[in-house]
Amino acid sequence: MNATSTPSLPYDTNRLRELAHLLIGTISEFAQAGWTPATSSNFSHRLDEHHVAITVSGRDKRCLREEDIIAVDLDGNAVGHPHTPSAETLLHTQLYRRFPEIGCVLHTHSLTQTVASRVYAGAGHISLKDYELLKAFEGHSTHETTLDVPVFCNTQNMNILAAQVDTLLDKQRMWGYLINGHGMYTWGNTLADARRHLEALEFLLHCELDLLKLRGYL
């Protein structure tokens, strides 16, 4: 290999490029909906058994480019790219490590998610019960059920937060969680699944907040 040759990378660069365009299109829609304010939020898709395609930190989600999606290993280290991924990358990779079937993780910061995280922080969770839209979640085939969405305390120590998430995953199945004053993580086996879970939670959280207002609690 001569001095100007590019070293081979341990993942399919064409696949990374495909995923970048797939993610960018979806993220742009989320940005237009107001779910990614002030360059917040991060999004990822499984690249292969050992790597994940993920957005770099600090980019305006309304105008991402292909180079704003990089590859990281399952420990969250950038592979073949000079950019340092967000510290929150760990919250993505822990899910890919734990669940080989998971294909996509979405982290958003909508107004509804952030307000709900504040309102229910004291309880530590929000219970969504008897909504028809609960059938949008993998494993739910009836509205006659309850879905508990955890609310974790915000912290800059991602190792602590990841450990708390892992502990709860040992006890219950879930497709998303809130972080107090921060936002929401959702995931699924495919991008379509993760997006469906995100949209369902966004709608149901809005319903719960509106009900609190109608009852005079907010």
UniProtKB/Swiss-Prot annotation:
User: Which residues does Zn(2+) bind?
Assistant: H107, H109
| GO cellular component: a single term | cytoplasm
Question: Which pathway or pathways does this protein act in?
Answer: Amino-acid biosynthesis; L-methionine biosynthesis via salvage pathway; L-methionine from S-methyl-5-thio-alpha-D-ribose 1-phosphate: step 2/6
Question: Could you tell me the EC number(s) of this protein?
Answer: 4.2.1.109
A GO BP annotation:
L-methionine salvage from methylthioadenosine
Alphabetically ordered keywords of this record? Amino-acid biosynthesis, Lyase, Metal-binding, Methionine biosynthesis, Zinc
Which EC class is the enzyme in?
lyase
Q: Name one Pfam family in it.
A: Aldolase_II
State the source organism's domain of life: Bacteria
Catalytic activity, reaction form: 5-(methylsulfanyl)-D-ribulose 1-phosphate = 5-methylsulfanyl-2,3-dioxopentyl phosphate + H2O
**SMART domains, alphabetized:** Aldolase_II
Q: Does the keyword Metal-binding apply?
A: yes
A single GO molecular-function term is: zinc ion binding
Q: How is the cofactor bound?
A: Binds 1 zinc ion per subunit.
Cofactors demanded by this protein: Zn(2+)
Protein purpose: Catalyzes the dehydration of methylthioribulose-1-phosphate (MTRu-1-P) into 2,3-diketo-5-methylthiopentyl-1-phosphate (DK-MTP-1-P).
User: What does the sequence similarity comment in the record state about its family?
Assistant: Belongs to the aldolase class II family. MtnB subfamily.
UniProt name for this protein = Methylthioribulose-1-phosphate dehydratase
